[in-house]
Amino acid sequence: MNAGRRAAGTLLAAALLLAGCSFGPGGEGGEEEPGPSASTRPGDGKAAGMRGITLPSWNTGDYSSPVAAAYLRQIAATGARWVTFTPTWYQDGAADAGMHTTGETAGDDDLRHVIGLAHRTGLKVMLKPHVDLAKGGDRAGIRPRDAGAWFTAYERFITHYAKLAEGAGAERFAVGTELAGTSRDGARWSKVVRAVRAQYRGPLTYAANYDEYRTVPFWDDLDVIGIDAYWPLADRPTADAARLRDAWKPITQELAAFSARHHRRILFTEAGYVSQRGATTAPYSWTVSKSAGEDEQAAAYEALLTALDGKPWWAGVCWWMWDDWPDSGETPRRLAYTPHGKPAEDVLRRRWRAGSTGAD
């Protein structure tokens, strides 16, 4: 989810999550360049669905905060097996060629600390670094004037975190999130992926927005297709889980075909709904209405899991998001994306804790 949109506190944020299955990197000979793992392909009996939740950070010290451990325990108590962390750098303008840390960027030592904390809590980790616009706005609008300079800066940024992820033992890594303004440049992105593989030996994905994934040309360089699954499911407010489940049918048919074409499973690197009336009409929006809609949020969780669980091409979901930081400046908690303390959390506990068959 776009932190710039969060800071703006208004509509439109289409975002990120990720985690997945125990896939290893490819490459059979010692001299061969690492590549995607064949075990990520649809129908592989060893591949399992991810059960994950994102714990974002909005300030430098969030991940070293005393409450971080409590949040991780709460996430694990839902039956989740994975947590995603989102260190974020910023660029000042959409056409700029550089990015930098700010007071909102998680510190490296804090990130290492929280990865270790997650492991001690029994959770696997996906590291999903983000680039956002410092003054707010959609990161999909990043379209640098000098593409070559931007990709050079981006490669420095993303390989920094790839090396950190390798050293800290993170089990999965995302090479980018919702960068639709650059993601059609397949040659440059393939170079980025190769640079990441030189630093990180685990499975890789890219988190494309739901309206971006079809135009990404470098899926075959990665181990799993990542989609931030913010498809609108209704044209008016509804807490009818059956109706919402039916809305997934044409989407899942399209995704099954896309997975087959690319011989890759599809991970919902993000999916989520605010607890507001009308959330299912615009899942990407932080502010759909001022009216609470916890039942609609719960119905949307139920519908997604019912519609997708058991699909051989589906690699699972990392929900956006578990965000209870006292200083996050986000939408009031009762209206926010977090399922914590709401009926949606009960859905996760019921679905995820009932059994572990096919889960990672």
State the predicted function of each range.
Residues 2, 21-24, 39-47, 283-286, ...:
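Aromatic-rich peripheral "rim/lid" segments of glycoside hydrolase catalytic domains that contact
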Residues 2-26:
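Secretory targeting and sorting signals
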Residues 24-27, 32-77:
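Boundary/entry segment of secreted carbohydrate-active catalytic domains
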Residues 61-77, 151-164, 209-218, 298-307:
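Short, acidic/polar
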Residues 61-77, 100-120:
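Aromatic- and glycine-enriched glycan-recognition loops and surfaces
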Residues 106-108, 113-121, 128, 203-205, ...:
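Glycoside hydrolase catalytic-domain groove-lining segments
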Residues 156-157, 172, 182-207:
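Active-site neighborhood of glycoside hydrolase catalytic domains
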